[in-house]
């Protein structure tokens, strides 16, 4: 089994009835319908669980559905603990991470619902749970409808033939990181930026302005279902101005294929880490934020950054489809495998070199 095969992740359909009563559910009181998806499923099926960490976003946004979340949560969980995540200052969440670890001591499984989480919060939270000596389920529900619809995009494009419209978010506030997700490795070396393009070209533009990257790799999402294929061309058109900063190299992958994303990011890292500082930004889908966490733990020298927007558009997503689940029998053990990946990979390379040397000697004789 290769080093990559030992850290493969499996995404399967999630059954709420399969969860024991003694879980700690971690979710966000966001503005999307899918922020309430798990709670709705639990209520529909009459399920009760032990405890919940409910995360409220700052700065305050009236579109976030805290009251709805709280009302449903009180009918599902025996204990609810509220915590605050400041999108503009993710470092402030450190104390909450310690408290979440303390709360986990009284349960048999932790369930992290990334469906409506900020992508930076996904990385910050999973990284903060690295020492969790328990089973962990990462659950994710796609939205039923993703904005903008094609007609809205075409209308905006026609009005702004020279400028790029942006959807879903307003302008970028600043680029953030945290102490544990940053890296001082390769100081002074040229920088490679890896990001996932979306409908707001200002996000990656802000990354390039902030970091002065010499190389830009864009991981584009291949649309599923096929009727959404127009979105890739739209995102390319919206982000076309990035070439005024640096000409990007583009790759395509299925955003929901965790292992394909890990393998692609690993390939880019291997090609450039000896000569460049590697920065990675989780600007893509929620599951790609999970793979960003994996890469950071495979290679601690990777520098994680994220462009925080001021606010989100009224129309972002609609509806909530069925949950899928990444189930890990022991999260700390899995993180250890990620950490040991570098050693296993070096061992594989050494064996390849030794076999090549033996073949060369054989040919000489």
Question: What residue ranges belong to the model's regions?
Answer:
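Long, low-complexity, Lys/Arg-enriched
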Residues: 1-109, 120-365
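Interfaces and regulatory segments of ATP-dependent nucleotide/adenylate/phosphodiester-chemistry enzymes
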Residues: 115
């Amino acid at each position: 089994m290769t080093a990559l095969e030992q850290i493969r992740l499996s995404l399967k359909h999630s059954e709420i009835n399969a969860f024991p009563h003694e879980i700690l559910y971690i979710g966000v009181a966001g503005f999307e319908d899918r922020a309430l998806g798990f709670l709705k499923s639990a209520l529909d099926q009459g399920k009760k669980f032990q405890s919940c960490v409910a995360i409220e976003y700052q700065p305050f946004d009236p579109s976030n559905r805290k009251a709805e979340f709280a009302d449903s949560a009180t009918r599902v969980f025996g204990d609810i603990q509220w915590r605050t995540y400041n999108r503009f200052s993710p470092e402030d969440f450190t104390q909450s991470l310690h408290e979440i670890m303390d709360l986990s001591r009284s349960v048999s499984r932790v369930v992290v619902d990334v469906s409506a989480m900020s992508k930076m919060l996904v990385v910050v939270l999973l990284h903060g749970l690295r020492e969790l000596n328990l089973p962990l389920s990462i659950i994710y529900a796609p939205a039923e409808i993703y904005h903008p619809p094609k007609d809205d995009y075409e209308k905006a494009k026609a009005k702004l033939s020279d400028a790029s419209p942006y959807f879903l978010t307003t302008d970028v506030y600043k680029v953030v990181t945290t102490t544990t997700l940053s890296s001082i490795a390769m100081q002074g070396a040229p920088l490679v930026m890896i990001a996932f393009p979306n409908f707001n070209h200002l996000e990656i533009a802000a990354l390039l302005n902030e970091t002065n990257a010499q190389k830009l790799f864009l991981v584009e999402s291949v649309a599923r279902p096929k009727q959404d294929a127009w979105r890739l061309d739209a995102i390319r058109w919206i982000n076309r101005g990035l070439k005024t900063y640096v000409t990007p190299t583009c790759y395509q992958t299925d955003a929901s294929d965790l292992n394909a994303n890990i393998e692609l990011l690993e390939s880019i890292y291997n090609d450039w880490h000896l000569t460049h500082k590697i920065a990675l930004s989780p600007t893509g889908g929620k599951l790609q934020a999970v793979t960003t966490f994996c890469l950071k733990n495979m290679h601690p020298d990777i520098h994680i950054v994220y462009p925080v927007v001021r606010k989100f558009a009224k129309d972002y997503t609609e509806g909530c489809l069925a949950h899928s689940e990444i189930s890990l029998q022991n999260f700390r053990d899995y993180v250890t495998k990620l950490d040991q990946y570098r050693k296993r990979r070096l061992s594989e390379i050494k064996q390849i070199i030794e076999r090549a040397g033996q073949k060369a000697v054989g040919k000489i004789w």
